[in-house]
């Protein structure tokens, strides 16, 4: 596994090719008993599918993480690149009880398949893309786990496809993106 920083995606030919011409799987992690991971599959810059992975409920975090691992392993396709939410360190300090299981979930997702590249993207980065494509910006974003996973994939594509900088005008977005579904 090669971890790629979002700011370095254009310098990594393998990761850049994976995003623009290969299969990308994006996962919005979940760890709580009531939440499920969102996912998005994108092939050569075209959104193929996105939704929620139904993970069986479990009594302990260990069993929940095992169920997340098995669900990712069994239900998601192999991919050239995994995009996952990068949980900022200050979240861990501010919300330790909810953030630790979320970080564990990220590790379990990364270990579930032999992803050649992993692109962790912080929420502030993909929210900046939300602000560029959603009318009314983040206030009108319909925040759901599957939409968050979709935005992770859209952000990976946007960072890779837009040279040299991501600008609102003439923004290249993946095909098959229905922005209307992301609006409240």
Can you say where each PLM-predicted feature lies in the sequence?
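Phosphate- and other anionic-substrate recognition elements at nucleic-acid/protein interfaces
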Residues: 1-184
């Amino acid at each position: 596994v090669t971890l790629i920083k979002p700011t370095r995606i254009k310098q990594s030919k393998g990761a850049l090719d994976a995003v623009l011409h290969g299969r990308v799987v994006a996962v919005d992690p979940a760890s709580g008993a009531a939440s499920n991971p969102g996912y998005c599959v994108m092939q050569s810059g075209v959104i193929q599918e996105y939704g929620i992975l139904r993970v069986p409920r479990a009594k302990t975090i260990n069993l929940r993480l095992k169920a997340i691992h098995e669900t990712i392993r069994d239900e998601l396709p192999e991919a050239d690149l995994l995009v996952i939410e990068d949980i900022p360190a200050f979240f861990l300090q501010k919300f330790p009880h909810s953030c630790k299981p979320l970080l564990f979930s990220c590790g379990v997702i990364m270990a579930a398949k032999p992803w050649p590249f992993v692109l962790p993207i912080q929420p502030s980065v993909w929210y900046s893309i939300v602000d560029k494509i959603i009318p009314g910006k983040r206030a009108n974003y319909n925040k759901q786990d599957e939409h968050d996973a979709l935005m992770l994939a859209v952000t990976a594509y946007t960072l890779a496809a837009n040279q040299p900088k991501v600008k609102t005008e003439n923004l290249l977005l993946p095909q098959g993106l229905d922005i209307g579904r992301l609006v409240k």
